[in-house]
A protein has these predicted regions:
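Feature activates predominantly on carbohydrate-active enzymes
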Residues: 1-113
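Gly/Pro-rich turn-and-neighbor structural signature
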Residues: 95, 99-169
Length: 169
């Protein structure tokens, strides 16, 4: 994934794949991905999937705005000039989405490693979120960085259940 595009077909979410900078759009169907994996295996190449979260999610949030905090008054901007591009991992809908997408992509890719991004989250992206603030209080999490550590451990545990090793930037 990237700000402007989601190039992998996802069965259970609205169609936003093929969006982005390419004038022709485009995406990889699950059959395309399976074919690419077979070709890579013939060449002894492993393909590492990447779902770049929690930031870099502008395109995703255009079709699934429920994954962000609707009442946050913070305007965050990342290095790519996209505003408010970060999902809110404290929301139940976001947790469901994370489990679902990581499971679906893990099932497609038989290789050991799975990349989850984790770079360039705007520093203030979560500080105005009432749900994150409440979650931090309830779980004795002291800072945004500690909350991000909670998030990455949550993702690592999802992927461990699928026998994947997590990679980050």
């Amino acid at each position: 994934t990237s700000e402007g595009a989601f190039r992998g077909y996802k069965q259970k979410i609205p169609p936003f794949y093929g969006s982005g900078y390419s004038k022709n759009g485009g995406y990889y169907s699950q059959d395309d991905i399976r074919e690419l994996i077979l070709y890579a295996k013939k060449l002894n190449i492993e393909i590492m999937p990447e779902v770049d979260l929690p930031a870099h999610s502008w395109t995703l949030l255009q079709v699934m705005p429920e994954l962000k905090d609707e009442v946050s008054n913070v305007v965050s901007e990342d290095v790519g000039s996209y505003k408010n591009n970060t999902i809110n991992p404290s929301l139940e809908k976001t947790k469901y989405f994370l489990n679902d997408i990581l499971n679906e992509i893990s099932n497609l890719f038989p290789f050991k490693y799975f990349h989850v991004g984790l770079d360039e989250r705007p520093k203030n992206s979560w500080e105005g979120s009432p749900t994150i603030i409440e979650f931090m209080k309830q779980n004795n999490i002291k800072s945004q960085e500690d909350y991000q550590n909670y998030y990455i451990n949550y993702v690592i545990n999802i992927l461990k259940l699928r026998d994947k090793t997590t990679a980050v930037w």
